[in-house]
Amino acid sequence: MIRGERVIGILAAGGSGQRAGVAKQWLVLGGESVLRRSARVLAACDAVDGLVVVVPPGDEARGEAELAGLGKPVRAVAGGPARADSVRNGLAAADGAVVLVHDAARPFASAALAGRVAEAAARDGAALAALPATDTVKRAEAGAEVPRVLETLDRRTVWLAQTPQGFRRAVLEQAYAAAGPSASAATDECALVEAAGAPVTLVPGEPGNFKITGPDDVRRARALLEAPVATGVGYDTHRFAPGRRLVLGGVEFEGDGLLGHSDADVCAHAIGDAILGAAGLGDLGRHFPDTDPRWKGVSSLALLREIAAKAAERGWRVGNCDVTLAAKRPKIAPRAEEMRARLAGALGISPAQVNVKATTGEGMGFVGREEGVAAHAIALLVRAAG
C-alpha cells in the first residue's frame, strides 16, 4: 500500500510472442519462466498488494499456477487482441486505487524501481520508468522502403519508455474512455494518458531493464541468467562375471566381463552419470532402468549418445570429461587412447576432450581383491551457442 491505498500489479502477458518466435512469457530461463521472473519484480515490491496476470485466452489456470508461491494474491484473466485491450481487461480485474502495469517480458527490472514508479503514480496520477536517450536520435519517414533522415531530434528531450508504468486507477480509466476504439492502437498505457491531456511523470529507469522481444534478446537474457558451464560427477561399479565380454570405454578386453543389464561398461556409465548430473537430469538408472528390455545387452556407447542428446535438449554440449578406473585388471594404459577415441565418438567431441586413466587401488577393497571394477568421472558441460 501507499498512503493506505491498495496497489495492484498488472502483468501484460497476453501476447503470442510472434516477434521472438516463441511465447515469451512461458520461456524458461535459468530454471524459471520469464513470466514468473517478471512477476517477482512486482511481488517483491512492498507497495504492491496483489497481482493480476493477463494471459492468452485459455491460459488462465496456467497463469495462476505459474505465479503461485510469490507471497502475493494472484488473479489471472484473459487478454484481448492487442496489448491495450489486455491491459484494459487487467484493469477491470484489479481492485487497487493505484495500478502498476509491467511487461511480462521485462524480467530484469528491480522491485525498487517498481516502488519508485508506484510512489510517483500515487502522487502525480501517472508515471513511467524511462531512460534518457544517450545516442543521437534521428527521425525518419515511417514505412519508407529506403529510410532517410527527416530531422535530428534534440536527445535531451528524448526518453526511452520502460515498464513498470503506474497510474491512479481513475486516471487510466478516463484515458481509456477518452480514446474509445482507438485505444487498441496504443503501444503503452502512458500514450493513452498523454492523449487525454493528463501529465505523466518520468522516473529514471534502469539500463538492464530490457524487454525480451526477439531472438537476440533471448540470447542476452540466457547469458545473464544461465551459467555458461556446469559440472557433474559420476561413479559406477560392476562385479566380474565369468562368461561375459569385458568392455571398458567402448573397447573389448580379454578376461572375465562385468555383470550388468547392458554391456556393463563401467567407464561409460560413470561418464554418462556425470553428464546427466551436470545437466540436472538425474542419474543413469532413471533413464536406462535395468527393468527395460530395450537396454538388455546394449553397448554403453549407445547410452552415451542418448545422454549427449538429452543434454543438448537442455542447451548443453560436452566440454570435456575425465574418468579414473579403479581396477587390478585389465591393464588400461596400453589401450587408453583407443578408449578415448571411442568415448569421444559417442559424445560427438574430440578425443582431446576425453581423458582416461587408471589406478589399482593399492590392493585395497573389492578392487584389490579383484572382485570388480569401479570408475569415477567428472564432466564439464558448456552452454551451447544460440
Swiss-Prot record:
Gene Ontology biological process terms in this record: isopentenyl diphosphate biosynthetic process, methylerythritol 4-phosphate pathway; terpenoid biosynthetic process
UniProtKB keywords: Isoprene biosynthesis, Lyase, Metal-binding, Multifunctional enzyme, Nucleotidyltransferase, Transferase
Site label Positions MEP for the nucleophilic attack, positions: 155, 211
Region (2-C-methyl-D-erythritol 2,4-cyclodiphosphate synthase): 230-386
Site for Transition state stabilizer, residues: 19, 24, 261, 360
Listed pathway(s): Isoprenoid biosynthesis; isopentenyl diphosphate biosynthesis via DXP pathway; isopentenyl diphosphate from 1-deoxy-D-xylulose 5-phosphate: step 2/6; Isoprenoid biosynthesis; isopentenyl diphosphate biosynthesis via DXP pathway; isopentenyl diphosphate from 1-deoxy-D-xylulose 5-phosphate: step 4/6
E.C. designation(s): 2.7.7.60, 4.6.1.12
MF term (GO), any: metal ion binding
Residues holding 4-CDP-2-C-methyl-D-erythritol 2-phosphate: 236-238, 261-262, 283-285, 288-292, 359-362, 366, 369
Catalytic activity: 2-C-methyl-D-erythritol 4-phosphate + CTP + H(+) = 4-CDP-2-C-methyl-D-erythritol + diphosphate; 4-CDP-2-C-methyl-D-erythritol 2-phosphate = 2-C-methyl-D-erythritol 2,4-cyclic diphosphate + CMP
Region (2-C-methyl-D-erythritol 4-phosphate cytidylyltransferase): 1-229
Residues bound to a divalent metal cation: 236, 238, 269
Protein name: Bifunctional enzyme IspD/IspF
Gene source species: Anaeromyxobacter dehalogenans (strain 2CP-C)
Gene expressing this chain: ispDF
